[in-house]
Amino acid sequence: MLSCVAMTMMGKMDKAEKIRFLCEDETRVGLKTISGRKITAKGVKPIGQVQWKFQATYIYGVVEPKTGENFFYEFSHLNSQCFEIFLELVSQHFADSILIIQLDNGRFHKAKKLKIPNNIILMFQPPHCPESNPIEQIWQYIKRGLRWKLPASLDELRLLITARLAVMTNDIIASIVGRTHILEALSVVDI
C-alpha cells in the first residue's frame, strides 16, 4: 500500500518534472542581546554589553539538504497567515518542482483554513524532536554571528541578518544541513 505522501505525489507528478526535499522552520530574532562565549584568560569571567529591548522579527526559511538551495523571508508575526504567504512564495521560488517539505507540528502549520500550493506536500516530523530538522543548525549558525551585537533598531538588526545570510553560500548551507542519513534516503528514492 502506498503512503499518503506517495499517493499525493503521484497526483501531482504530471505538473512538474523535479521532486525536491526541503526542511522548513521559523526563528525569532530580536534586539535582546544574544550572549555567548568569549575568549578570556583562565579564571576571568567574560564581560560584555547587553541590551534588554524586547522587539523582534521572525525569519521563515527552507533549505534543501542535497544542494543547499534555500529561501528565507522575514515576517513580523508567527501565524498561519504569514505561513500561508511564505508557502506561496516558496512555491513560486521553486515553481518547476514538486516540494516535499519537512516541518514541525506548530499549530499554525496545521490551521484548518491554511491553503497549501499545488506543488507543495507537507511532511510533519515527530513531535518534540526539533533535532530531526537540520534547518535548526542554520538558525544556530546565523545567531552565532549575531552574538554580542547591539543593534539600535529592527532595521539595523535586519541589515545584520541580511549580511549574515549573504555569506551563506549553497555550499555552506549544504555542509550544515546535508546529513548523511537524509542524503542516503533521498538517493534511494532517486530524489
What are these regions (language model features)?
Residues 2-84, 88, 184, 188:
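Extended, low-complexity cationic-aromatic segments
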Residues 97-109, 133:
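Acidic/histidine-rich, metal-coordinating catalytic segments
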Residues 45-52, 118-137:
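RNase H-like polynucleotidyl transferase catalytic core
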Residues 23-25, 61-62, 68, 87, ...:
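Mobile genetic element proteins and their domesticated derivatives, centered on retroelements
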Residues 22-24, 100-103, 123-126:
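Short beta-strand segments
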Residues 17-21, 136-191:
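C-terminal anion-handling pockets and recognition modules
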Residues 16-17, 94-97, 118:
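A structural signal for short coil/turn segments at secondary-structure junctions
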Residues 111-119:
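Short, aromatic/basic amphipathic alpha-helical patches
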